[in-house]
Curated annotation (Swiss-Prot):
This is Photosystem I assembly protein Ycf3. Signal peptide: none annotated. It comes from Nephroselmis olivacea. Essential for the assembly of the photosystem I (PSI) complex. May act as a chaperone-like factor to guide the assembly of the PSI subunits. The lineage of its organism: Eukaryota, Viridiplantae, Chlorophyta, Nephroselmidophyceae, Nephroselmidales. One of its GO terms (cellular component) is chloroplast thylakoid membrane. The gene is ycf3.
């Protein structure tokens, strides 16, 4: 039984019903509908912390989905799972792939920045200030782009950019 039919959560059930109605009335191919079903099931599994199941669904959605824009969100969600699992290098790969297909994905830019910032913090702890500054500069570049796309979001990043004197080139 597909995960979307097992949801106990009212919001998930409502989303599933609305999504099913939209799939029936919108002119989409069987393949597109199937890809969306896998994507939806992946999101549901991911929300419940069932990352292995979510990845299986996302990979199947990727196999079926041909639209670059839709694929960008699948790739982004795969990146989220790898980030949650502490697999930052893998996460970056998926975020970059998502941005190749959809450069207007500020959340991917933000997550890339967060990873570089985290790595910068690790470099400081290791006593490598030169590397940390390079990583912080890289984080700043990604945050600036995310903020350019979504100016009212990422307030903490905006504050960090101001505090570290990296904002002058932003926005």
């Amino acid at each position: 039984m597909p995960r979307s039919q097992r949801n106990d959560n009212f919001i998930d059930k409502t989303f599933t019903v609305v999504a099913d109605i939209l799939l029936k009335v919108l002119p989409t191919t069987r393949r597109e509908k199937e890809a969306f079903t896998y994507y939806r099931d992946g999101m549901s599994a991911q929300a419940e912390g069932e990352y292995a199941e979510a990845l299986q669904n996302y990979y199947e959605a990727m196999r079926l989905e041909v639209d670059a824009y839709d694929r960008s969100y699948i790739l982004y969600n795969i990146g989220l799972i790898h980030t949650s699992n502490g697999e930052h290098a893998k996460a970056l790969e998926y975020y970059y792939q998502a941005l190749e297909r959809n450069p207007y994905l500020p959340q991917a830019l933000n997550n890339i920045a967060v990873i570089y910032h985290y790595r910068g913090e690790q470099a400081i702890e290791s006593g490598n200030s030169r590397i940390s500054n390079l990583l912080f500069d890289k984080a700043a570049d990604y945050w600036k782009e995310a903020i350019r796309l979504a100016p009212t979001n990422y307030i903490e990043a905006q504050n960090w950019l101001k505090i570290t004197n990296r904002l002058e080139e932003a926005i």
